[in-house]
Structures are given as structure tokens and as C-alpha cells.
Amino acid sequence: IGNMELSRRHHMIFEGPPGTGKTTVARIVAHLFYALGILENTTVIETKRNELEGKWVGDLSGKINEKVDSALGGVLFIDEAHQLYNKEDPYDKGKQVIQAFVPRLENDGEKFIAIIAGYTKEMEEFLKFDPGLASRFQHKIIFESYKPQVVAQIVVNILKKNKIEFNEKYVK
């Protein structure tokens, strides 16, 4: 986060094993980018595949558009995003979610931050499915097997180093 250039889009990929603080850091990102004046609010809409699918094959947008609309001004965090793509199933509804998500990243990309998270190997495979999806994410953060408290302390150190004011209660 400390080396990110200010740009108009700040979508991120978080990769790493479970329990490394990806969700915690997504919440911190919301507060950080709000403090920087990039986001309008600190809202974090957390979701997973089962909350994004349409009810039937052909329901292209599923609930992804509702989730993006809810996240406007804040952060949309899709945990275990790699589960959206099942290359073994040609009728998998997750593909339709991705196809509806890519235009929202492009058209509304300056109005929210999308963070997709998952396990490293699975995320790399997932991102190969749609090069358009991968190209919409400007930042990739690799999470090692740190405890959330350590990750929070790393973020605090970065914030302090960059002299960014923040409320410490949000990084605990």
C-alpha cells in the first residue's frame, strides 16, 4: 500500500493462505482511502460466490450489480473470488458473474474499490480465465502467513511512515 501511486482506479487483488488478514486489510483499506479523500465512505461490502450468482443460467448480472451498487463510494470485497470460475463446468453461473463484473469495474471503477481475494495458486488460475478481469486490477498484494495483528501493525507502520492520520481503533 505504501508504494501505490495515486491513480483514478485502485482495484486490488489479495492473494494468500486463509487466516492471513486479507479481510482485515480490506477493511483498513476502506478507512485509509476514505482518509485520503479517494473514497466517499468507509463501507465495505463483503461477499462470496453464493451471494453473487443469478438464480438461473442466463441471469447474466446475478446479484453482482446489486453488490457493486451497494459498494459505490466504498469497497467491494469478494472473498474466495477464485470460486467464481469452475473450468470443469461449461454451464457454471460464476462465468456470468465475471462477465457482468468486468464492465462495472471499467465503467464505475473510479466510484469504488474492488478487492478480490483468494488463495494464491487458485487466484492465478482464476485470473487466466478472463484477461479483461485481470487487467482491471492495478494492485496485487501477496499475504504471507502472518497473524491479523501483525498485518494490522504493518499497515499502522506504513500509515505512520507516510504521515497519514487514522483512528487506531480501526486497525485492531
Residue ranges and their predicted role:
Residues E40-A71:
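Short glycine-rich substrate-engagement loop in P-loop NTPases that contacts/grips substrate
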Residues T20, E51-E53, H82-L84, Y119-E124, ...:
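Conserved nucleotide-binding/hydrolysis micro-motifs of P-loop NTPases
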Residues H82-K121, K128-G132:
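Conserved catalytic/switch belt of AAA+ P-loop NTPases
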Residues N3-T42, E66-D69, F137:
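Walker A/P-loop
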Residues R49-D59, Q83-K95, K140-I141:
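Flexible beta-alpha connector loops of hexameric P-loop NTPases
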Residues L84, A152-I154, F166-K172:
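Short conserved motifs of the RecA-like P-loop NTPase core
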Residues K121, D130, A152-E165:
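Conserved AAA+ ATPase "sensor/coupling" helix adjacent to the nucleotide-binding pocket
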Residues L127-E144:
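A short helix-turn-beta junction within AAA+ P-loop NTPase domains corresponding to the substrate/partner-engaging
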